[in-house]
């Protein structure tokens, strides 16, 4: 079993309240989860309205497949409206 994790730091420049931030992040998280069959959660900066950190987890039997999924997630987030990707950190665990 291979587990891949991804930490993504975002800036939401057009967000003017926590309500705006939550709306954008909910849309992003739902889209990522459905499109890539991954688990997604907001992991830090919950009370700051212009920055966010989301964590992503993917599980599979092939390390290159898991890495490919995480890379595709990063590329998708880069072009998602309303957010700016600041940093991403990817780790792969398992055989």
Language-model segments: which ranges?
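C-terminal structural segments of small proteins and small subunits
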Residues: 59-95
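N-terminal first-folded block
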Residues: 1-35, 39
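Short beta-strand elements
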Residues: 36-43, 84-90
């Amino acid at each position: 079993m291979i587990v891949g994790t991804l930490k993504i730091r975002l800036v939401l420049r057009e967000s003017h309240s926590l309500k705006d931030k939550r709306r954008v992040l909910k849309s992003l998280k739902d889209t990522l989860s459905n499109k890539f069959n991954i688990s997604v959660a907001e992991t830090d900066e919950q009370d700051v309205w212009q920055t966010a950190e989301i964590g992503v987890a993917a599980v599979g039997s092939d390390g290159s497949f898991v890495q490919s999924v995480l890379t595709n997630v990063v590329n998708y987030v880069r072009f998602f409206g309303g957010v700016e990707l600041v940093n991403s950190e990817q780790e792969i665990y398992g055989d």
